[in-house]
Amino acid sequence: MEPVGVSHNTPEMDPPRNIQTPELPESGSVKDKIGKFSAYQQQPSGLKDAFGKTPTSIGANRSRTPQQIAAQLAAGRSTPGEITATHTGVSRTQGSRPTTSKRSDDNEGPPLLAPKPVWATSANTASVNKLLRSEADLPIRDKSIQRRPVAQISPIEAARLAAKKPRPPPVPRKPAAVATGPTSVPINVHSKGPESPEPTSKNHSSRHLEDTTIPFKAPPALPPRTGASSVPRKDLTNHRRLLDTNHGSRRRPSTPGTASLYTTSLSNSTTSLLDSSSGLDEGALSDAVVASSRASVRASQERKVPPPPPPERRARSRSLKQFPHTAKGEHTDSSSPSTHLRQTLREPTKIAENDEGYQRHKHLIRKHPHKHHEGDRRRWRSEITEKERKRYEGVWAANKGLLLPPAHLRVPEAYPPESSEMVVNLVAADIWSRSRLPRHVLAQVWDLVDGQHIGLLTREEFVVGMWLIDQQLKGHKLPPRVPASVWGSAKRISGVHIHGLPPA
């Protein structure tokens, strides 16, 4: 059984994928080295049997293969960066290799591209010392990050550049453009090519430095000045410098290099504006004043004033009612009518003083319509209205003659001959009780209207009793006796009105 990792069929070993193949060594050097170490392969069979039988002791007696020696010698003559990568690959392979190295011949896995680990033997001590010596002779690469020199600008030069730099009018509510300047470019610490493989720690430090050198985000632009909008378009060409210097002195710089000058330029913004305006032509300033005045005049003229309302037409009937005799407090409407409020109600017709009706009904016009007049309220107690009398007579006509015995059974002493036109006391009590007045109040009403005391009510008595109940329901008190005017209004014949007879 052959030792593990030794292959006689492959004379040369493929280099790793991540390492570029350097220049080939001189002819014969590889063969000499292979021949020098070929004696180590011819060992006694007892040692080979020990390799085959005891895999745990293979780390102490294992020899290096020709492929490993050739790869190590080739790596020794390559660039220092490649040597570092080779040693790194070897150390990683040593750390990740398990303790048992016995493999079967029928292994289907792909061959390892990395070289086999180097085991410490007495034969390869010279080669290792040679490699260490050659590595020590290499110059140590400075791994510090080199930064580009930052151009230093004095505050005076930065202020001059900011004042002289022509800038277009600012757009409102838009962020400023990407900052441009010598200090705004981030330092690129990553280099391209095979000669710049850096350790992982260097990459982390470069990322940290790159994050710290990111330029500050530009603040949003200031809104435009309101005074600039009143100038017409034709005059903007003459006064563009004044507007540019005004906006340029008040805008905050977006680059980190000039950020320290923002406070100084902001404090001296008024002085720079006056200095820049004094440098302009006097004719341009006068043109700006005239243009602003014209713009204000045009704005005031554009305001439309509503036309005055047309005068109201005077009615014809009003001119016909011009009486020669008028009261002292009255006056004719000679002036124009008021345009504030239009009159919607008609004016009351004016009546002459010599008219009899005006003098007779003058007391009906009251200055205080809500004032109480107790003397004028006596009329309701004096008579019954025609409407009320007709309603009460309808109730009497529907209930007269009820509960009376027939005419041939009536006693002449108990019932008068007109008893069929009367209302029985039981029927009257039933009708009046529907008013929900107390029984003693209804008894008082019965005593006031019952003049015959026979238990029957005539038409006038029933009508007056109904009227008294309605007055009680309206809130009026019962009188001690019924006035004669009330009895007279109840005895009228319906449909006939006799005001007075002519003299005979």
Swiss-Prot record:
Residues 388-493 form the EH domain. SUPFAM superfamilies: EF-hand (SSF47473). Residues 1-123, 135-264, 292-382 are annotated as: Disordered. GO terms for biological process: lipid metabolic process. Residues 360-372 have a biased composition (Basic residues). This is Increased rDNA silencing protein 4. The keyword Cell cycle does not apply. Residues 54-70, 85-101 have a biased composition (Polar residues). The keyword Lipid metabolism applies. Belongs to the IRS4 family. Residues 135-145, 232-244, 344-359, 373-382 have a biased composition (Basic and acidic residues). It holds the Pfam family EH. Positive regulator of phosphatidylinositol 4,5-bisphosphate turnover and negatively regulates signaling through the cell integrity pathway. Involved in rDNA silencing. It comes from the Eukaryota.
